[in-house]
Amino acid sequence: MGWFFQKKKEFDFGGELDRLEMKLEEAQYNIDNIQSQKKKILFRYTVCSLAIYTIGMAVWASRSSILFQHPLFSKLFRISLYILGVFSLYMFRWAIAWFCEKRLSRARMNLHKLNAEKRKILDALKSRKEYFETQALLEKYGEQPTLAQKKLSNAAAAKSVPGSSSSSSDPMHPQHWYDRVLEGLVGANENSENNREALICSHCFHHNGLASYGEKASDVRYVCLFCKAWNGPPIDKSLPSSEMDSNLQTNPSSISKGKKNNSNNTTQKGPNIISSPQVINASSPVRKAGKKKSKKALPTSPLSSSSPDASYNSVSDSFHTVAASVPESLTPTK
């Protein structure tokens, strides 16, 4: 009589949800497989049947005898026969598409039933289970955002990203078989998303738009809109010395002004201080004490922008050689 007092076995929500999840994945895979098969079958049938029928009609028309006495009637009959054959091929293509659509609708109905069953189990789970156990199961098997919500969020993210093209906001039209033929003849569209690399942040892995056509995503420098992190190759801040020399040569007047300011600061008026550093030449005659004549100082020619040889290196070298030749006794006292 022990079986009479046994408790009723509780419903296993976790196992049932696992089983439904596997069935949902199989149903979704079946839908994707049917759609891809439909596109391949229709494309191959359209191209192959039309090419074979056209070649066969051309061979038959060239080798067949005149059906009517008037040649114009014969041409009209062959053209009408060709059009009738093309129409029959199109009707057969429509029948194939209808059969694939029936399979696709049946698979979608199965997916809809599985989703409804999963929703019922989730509703029962919310009313029976404890809070923490329910929360864990809902996070694992809860319903994901719908397709419409995903499209709205993707559109808002594309508008907020400055690098994304304006063509991505336009509605996507289904690609037909003649679009593929034109892409093979003319070339792919440069603005298409399939021909441009996505900018994925290396830190938070968020989408930051698309790179330009022909440009690699690893060569694009940008700041992530979500984590504000820097992405792309680092910027080389060091400049070569040739660029610095060219910048100095473009403004020689500033160099001459800096030289004058340095000479005024180092040489001050005093009884034992000379006004400017001079080189003492042994061959120069010694002035007598009684004579008060003073030799006029030659005006120093400042650097001008017209002199082609003026550069920062030449000015600094000449200044240091003159300063080094002055005796220590003539240096200004503080």
Curated annotation (Swiss-Prot):
Q: Does the keyword Endoplasmic reticulum apply?
A: yes
Alphabetized, the UniProt keywords read:
Coiled coil, Endoplasmic reticulum, Golgi apparatus, Membrane, Metal-binding, Phosphoprotein, Transmembrane, Transmembrane helix, Zinc, Zinc-finger
Q: Name one GO cellular component term.
A: Golgi membrane
InterPro entries on file = Lnp, Lunapark_Znf
Zn finger (C4-type) start-end: 201-227
Compositional bias segments (type: Low complexity): 253-270, 297-315
Broad class of where this protein is predominantly found: endoplasmic reticulum
Where in the sequence is Phosphoserine found?
S284
State the family it belongs to: Belongs to the lunapark family.
Membrane topology, as annotated: Multi-pass membrane protein
Q: Where in the cell is it found?
A: Endoplasmic reticulum membrane; Golgi apparatus membrane
**Name of this protein:** Endoplasmic reticulum junction formation protein lunapark
| GO terms for MF | zinc ion binding
Q: Where is the composition biased (Polar residues)?
A: 239-252, 273-283
Region Disordered, annotated ranges: 237-315
Q: Which PANTHER family match?
A: ENDOPLASMIC RETICULUM JUNCTION FORMATION PROTEIN LUNAPARK (PTHR22166:SF12)
One short Pfam name that applies is Zn_ribbon_10
User: Which parts of the chain does the record assign to the membrane side Lumenal?
Assistant: 62-78
This molecule's function is given as: Plays a role in tubular endoplasmic reticulum network formation and maintenance.
| Disulfide bond entries | none
Q: Which residues lie on this side of the membrane: Cytoplasmic?
A: 1-40, 100-334
Kindly list the residue ranges recorded as spanning the membrane: 41-61, 79-99
> Tell me, which GO biological process terms does this entry list?
endoplasmic reticulum tubular network membrane organization; endoplasmic reticulum tubular network organization
